[in-house]
């Protein structure tokens, strides 16, 4: 008699909150937010930067970063230390589930392979079967505005499966190809942003004290 092999998932995506493809013109600034679910920012074109908690980050085409639950984050086009801004296209996916393993991704930037970039394309294609999309050049998929019924059966499950594939690929990459995963390059961001980081850390440590 054949003996079954039990599949024990490392992670599981159970909820999708937002799925965006934004084409931002130079000069765009998002002041920031925090929420109780995970979020990915992937740069499809151009460069972007911002704060992930107290840590500054910079992303170029083909790179992505995780924003952890309840961690403040913001975003701007271009790079913090550059005088010249630039257009930037990004994909933003926010999601929830059994994702404790992602804690090790904190404050790291991933450079994606062709395989991983193609997963993003497949996710967007499936999103068209689940969500209304409108807003000029931007493709907006929102949980608050889904179709009553999927255009294609299983589209939501496909999005979850594809996202799990991406996360598992990044998990393996961190273990097997650390050269494609980097800690946030704080030393290259200049004194101004080091000062911002120190101020935020000070405020966090003295949240309930008189300053």
Residue map of PLM features:
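Generic protein-terminus/edge-of-domain signal
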Residues: 1-59, 63-64, 71, 103-104, ...
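Short, Lys/Arg-enriched, Trp-marked, Pro/Gly-tolerant hinge/linker segments that flank
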Residues: 134-139, 144-161, 167-210
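A short hydrophobic beta-strand segment most commonly corresponding to one strand
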Residues: 66, 82-102
């Amino acid at each position: 008699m054949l003996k079954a092999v039990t599949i024990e998932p490392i992670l599981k995506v159970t909820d999708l909150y937002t799925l965006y493809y934004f084409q931002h013109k130079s000069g765009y600034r998002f002041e920031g937010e925090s929420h109780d679910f995970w979020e990915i920012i992937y740069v499809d074109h151009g460069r972007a930067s911002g704060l992930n908690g107290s840590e500054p980050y910079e992303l170029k085409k083909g790179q992505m970063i995780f924003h952890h639950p309840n961690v403040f984050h913001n975003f701007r086009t271009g790079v913090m230390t550059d005088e010249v801004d630039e257009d930037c296209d990004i994909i933003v996916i926010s999601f929830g589930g059994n994702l404790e393993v992602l804690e090790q991704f904190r404050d790291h930037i991933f450079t994606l392979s062709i395989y991983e970039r193609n997963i993003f394309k497949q996710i967007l294609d499936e999103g068209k079967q689940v969500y209304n999309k409108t807003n000029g050049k931007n493709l907006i998929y929102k949980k608050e505005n889904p179709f009553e019924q999927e255009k294609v059966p299983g589209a939501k499950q496909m999005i979850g499966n594809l996202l799990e594939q991406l996360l598992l690929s990044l998990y393996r990459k961190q273990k097997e190809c650390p050269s494609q995963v980097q800690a946030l390059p704080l030393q290259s961001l200049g004194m101004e942003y080091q000062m911002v980081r120190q101020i935020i850390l000070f405020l966090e440590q003295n949240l309930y004290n008189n300053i």
